[in-house]
């Protein structure tokens, strides 16, 4: 799933599975730049309850590179999401 190119001063965010269901969207554009450590708070402001119900168990990628927001890796938390970046919120993967 590719999103439309983000407008100037924004980045794209893709929502999969539970994140898409919770937001009612598959993608949107948010203002850039933003620190990765602030992303979940920004999403919580837009979609109250999403942090605890969805984001706590999701993985996050920035331009297809996994970053660790939940566990607090210092380098990942300080990473700045820039204009034109593509962020994805990915649910846990299971197999059976």
Curated annotation (Swiss-Prot):
It is found in: Cytoplasm. One of its GO terms (molecular function) is nucleotide binding. GO terms for biological process: Mo-molybdopterin cofactor biosynthetic process. InterPro entries: Beta-grasp_dom_sf, MOCS2A, MOCS2A_euk, Mopterin_synth/thiamin_S_b, ThiS/MoaD-like. GO terms for cellular component: molybdopterin adenylyltransferase complex; molybdopterin synthase complex. The modification 1-thioglycine is found at residue 96. The modification Glycyl adenylate is found at residue 96. It holds the Pfam family ThiS. It comes from the Eukaryota. HAMAP family: MOCS2A (MF_03051). Belongs to the MoaD family. MOCS2A subfamily. This is Molybdopterin synthase sulfur carrier subunit. It comes from Phaeosphaeria nodorum (strain SN15 / ATCC MYA-4574 / FGSC 10173) (Glume blotch fungus). The gene is cnxG.
């Amino acid at each position: 799933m590719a999103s439309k190119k983000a407008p100037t001063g924004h980045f794209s965010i893709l929502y999969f599975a539970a994140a898409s269901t919770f937001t009612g969207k598959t993608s949107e554009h948010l203002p850039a730049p933003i620190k990765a450590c602030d992303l979940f708070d920004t999403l919580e402001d837009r979609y109250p309850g999403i942090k605890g119900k969805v984001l706590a168990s999701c993985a996050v990628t920035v331009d297809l590179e996994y970053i660790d927001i939940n566990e607090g890796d210092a380098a990942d938390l300080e990473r700045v999401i820039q204009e034109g970046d593509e962020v994805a919120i990915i649910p846990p993967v299971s197999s059976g």
